[in-house]
């Protein structure tokens, strides 16, 4: 199965 898409989380 394809890897889960990486969603970058903005860090303030």
From Swiss-Prot:
CC per GO annotation: extracellular region
Keywords, alphabetical: Cell wall, Secreted
Superkingdom per UniProt: Eukaryota
UniProt-annotated location(s): Secreted, Cell wall
Keyword Secreted among UniProt keywords: yes
Native organism: Nicotiana tabacum
Protein name listed in UniProt: 26 kDa cell wall protein
């Amino acid at each position: 199965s394809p890897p889960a898409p990486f969603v970058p989380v903005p860090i303030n």
